[in-house]
A protein has these predicted regions:
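Short, well-ordered alpha-helical microsegments
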Residues: 156-160
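C-terminal capping/extension of enzyme domains
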Residues: 38-56, 78, 125-134, 138, ...
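Short, surface-exposed acidic-centric catalytic microdomains
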Residues: 67-128
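Internal catalytic-core helix/loop-beta-alpha segment
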Residues: 107-155
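Short, hydrophobic/glycine-enriched beta-strand segments
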Residues: 56-62
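Acidic, Ala/Val/Gly-enriched low-complexity intrinsically disordered segments
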Residues: 5-8, 12, 20, 24, ...
Length: 198
């Protein structure tokens, strides 16, 4: 990454970035603008799906975010509402550990995975995803009585419809994303839409 620092009051002239970079402007505590470029990375999914033979609901995301990869588990960003929302739907306390999260999913017959096995992506930006290799959902669908598949967000839904639906023949119901990038949706609004799963 390249870094350039100028006083906040100074006019900054930006040239167009190359196709595979995105320019991010941040305001630092001392009121200086820092411009950084974020390049594409090739990411391979490193988590196993969470399910067992009793799973009836499958929730699919896109790909683990940077924070999720750092924490080595699904929906690891502190501002992602997934675990808080799911706990509310299941009438349980919000789980904190990987073991608690996994146990809650399996208790309520919920399976989770993602639609992307590998891709090129800038940071955690779903809109930048390209060169997708999809996950093989057969390992779940062939071993569970999944009655409904849900997408956590529009991007996951679109990718499923493009890559997996022609193979599975199964429809997907797209739910609003729990990502912090979808901050316009409050937890209460998400709860109303997501209540269909439980």
């Amino acid at each position: 990454c390249s870094h350039g620092v100028r006083p906040a009051t100074q006019t900054v002239s930006l040239t167009q970035s190359p196709q595979d970079t995105i320019l991010v402007i941040k305001l630092t505590p001392n009121h200086q603008k820092v411009s950084t470029t974020m390049e594409y990375e090739h990411i391979t999914h490193s988590f196993e799906p969470i399910y067992n033979e009793d799973s009836e609901i499958l929730i699919l995301g896109t790909l683990p975010s940077v924070k999720s990869r750092e924490n080595n588990f699904y929906y690891g960003h502190k501002q992602n509402r997934f675990w808080k929302l799911l706990a509310k739907l299941c009438e349980e306390e919000t789980p904190q550990t990987v073991e608690e999260k996994t146990a809650m999913l399996l208790r309520h017959r919920i399976a989770i995975w993602d639609v992307i096995q590998s891709c090129d992506i800038k940071g955690s930006s779903d809109s930048s995803i390209k060169n997708v290799t999809p996950t093989d959902l057969k390992q779940i669908l062939d071993h569970c009585q999944i009655r409904q598949i849900y997408a956590n967000g529009n991007k996951a839904g679109a990718l499923y419809k493009k890559y997996q639906q022609p193979l599975t023949g199964r429809e997907i119901l797209v739910l609003p994303s729990t990502s912090p990038a979808n901050a316009a949706w409050s937890l209460e609004r998400l709860y109303e839409k997501w209540s269909v799963i439980h």
